[in-house]
């Protein structure tokens, strides 16, 4: 994996500028700025590196939205580089404007949910969790079970 990755980044025909940089952007009517940290900045591209268990055939929507924030913040073409044991699969993120609109819509949906009440637990009860999803750890599952009154 290390050799594949090393060879891949050595072959990029673009001037390297910076690593682990910060972007801060304003999106639409959202009252707080979006802050993100990209992995690699080149003269013409901003790249985010993702390690994955298997080779990817395309960019996930969440990663495309993340890279689009970096693109707006840097003014560069966004790329996601998926690194697996078999090599590097680089993908250019297309439709940055559409992805930024999705970020804004998600933020507005969250803002609407939070506007229902000053009580965060009431806001949480506006949705119902899928505790079978891998993202839930044991500690957060216990808290969720308490909030949503879910049995074992």
Where are the regions a protein language model picked out?
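Active-site-adjacent loop/helix micro-motif of nuclease/hydrolase catalytic cores
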Residues: 55-63
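Soluble or luminal CAZymes and related metallo-dependent hydrolases
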Residues: 1, 62, 102-105
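Metal-dependent nuclease catalytic regions and adjoining charged, substrate-binding loops involved
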Residues: 17, 30, 74-152
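Metal-dependent nuclease catalytic cores that hydrolyze phosphodiester bonds in DNA/RNA
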Residues: 1-38, 136-152
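Conserved catalytic cores of phosphodiester-cleaving nucleases, focusing on short active-site segments
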Residues: 38-56, 70
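Short, structured patches in soluble enzyme cores that scaffold and shape functional sites
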Residues: 21-25, 50-51, 82
């Amino acid at each position: 994996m290390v050799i594949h990755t090393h060879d891949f980044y050595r072959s990029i025909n673009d001037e390297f500028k910076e690593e682990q940089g910060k972007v801060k952007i304003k999106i639409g009517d959202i009252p707080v700025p979006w802050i993100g940290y990209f992995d690699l900045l080149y003269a013409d591209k901003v790249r985010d590196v993702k390690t994955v268990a298997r080779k990817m055939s395309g960019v996930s929507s969440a990663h495309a939205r993340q890279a689009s924030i970096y693109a707006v913040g840097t003014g560069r073409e966004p790329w996601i580089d998926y690194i697996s044991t078999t090599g590097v699969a680089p993908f250019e993120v297309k439709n940055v404007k559409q992805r930024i609109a999705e970020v804004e819509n998600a933020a507005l949906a969250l803002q609407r949910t939070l506007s229902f009440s000053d009580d965060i637990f009431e806001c949480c009860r506006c949705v119902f969790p899928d505790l079978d999803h891998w993202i839930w750890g044991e500690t957060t599952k216990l808290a969720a079970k308490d909030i949503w009154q879910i049995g074992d």
